[in-house]
Amino acid sequence: MQFFIDTANIDEIKQAIDWGILDGVTTNPTLAAKTGRPFMDVVKDILSIVDGPVSLETVSLDTEGMVKEGRFLAELGDNVVVKIPMTKEGMKAVNILEEEGIPTNVTLIFSPMQALIAAKAGASYVSPFIGRLDDISTDGMNLVRDIRTIFDNYGYETEIIAASIRHPIHVLEAAKAGADIATIPFNVLEALFRHPLTDIGIDKFLKDWEKVPNKPF
């Protein structure tokens, strides 16, 4: 499973890179706004340090606008993936951009049929939003399982990005359900490292080490 980080915060991205576990980045207008910096400055900084896929979102709602913005974003780097919303106009844009060799990530997926439509339109990625479904008392992980089954049944190469991740259990369940990628907020990514027994074990090792005579370091 690949780990993307869902952020536009450069410091968070750098830390994830240093941990050696980062495969890519996803952003959106909300995350970009949280930085308080000009959008293009944020994007250029991200692309300067990330080798893997970086999803950048269009903001137009019509096909022409999405295609225009998608082409602009794609020119910023070879690893740019254009995020397109799951709409009829969006699927037209996906078809055009993918035909031009520009990879797309269809976002705001909430049903298996939406994912199937995106795959048929040629999307490189689909992003089912797990947490938002959980928020309305629907099991979001069932969506990932259904998409995985459908894609496997028909040989679609579109990759599944489990999105709207809220806690470590979401990551675990997405991995078990067969998601290709989980895009994870920084706080959840940090939480994946932690376990109380690990902390207890480290503390015991250090205390025992203090008893060792003539330590080399």
Swiss-Prot record:
Domain of life: Bacteria
Residues the record marks as active site: 83
Record key words, sorted: Cytoplasm, Pentose shunt, Schiff base, Transferase
EC number: 2.2.1.2
Catalyses which reaction(s): D-sedoheptulose 7-phosphate + D-glyceraldehyde 3-phosphate = D-erythrose 4-phosphate + beta-D-fructose 6-phosphate
Pathway recorded for this protein: Carbohydrate degradation; pentose phosphate pathway; D-glyceraldehyde 3-phosphate and beta-D-fructose 6-phosphate from D-ribose 5-phosphate and D-xylulose 5-phosphate (non-oxidative stage): step 2/3
InterPro entries: Aldolase_TIM (IPR013785), TAL/FSA (IPR001585), Transaldolase_3B (IPR022999), Transaldolase_3B/F6P_aldolase (IPR004731), TSA/FSA_arc/bac (IPR033919)
Subcellular location(s) of the protein: Cytoplasm
CDD domains: Transaldolase_FSA
Molecular-function GO terms, alphabetical: aldehyde-lyase activity; transaldolase activity
Entry's Gene Ontology BP terms: carbohydrate metabolic process; pentose-phosphate shunt
GO CC term, one of those recorded: cytoplasm
Gene3D superfamilies, per database record: Aldolase class I
Its job: Transaldolase is important for the balance of metabolites in the pentose-phosphate pathway.
Family annotation (HAMAP family): Transaldolase_3b (MF_00494)
Annotated family: Belongs to the transaldolase family. Type 3B subfamily.
Protein name, as recorded: Probable transaldolase
Gene name of this polypeptide: tal
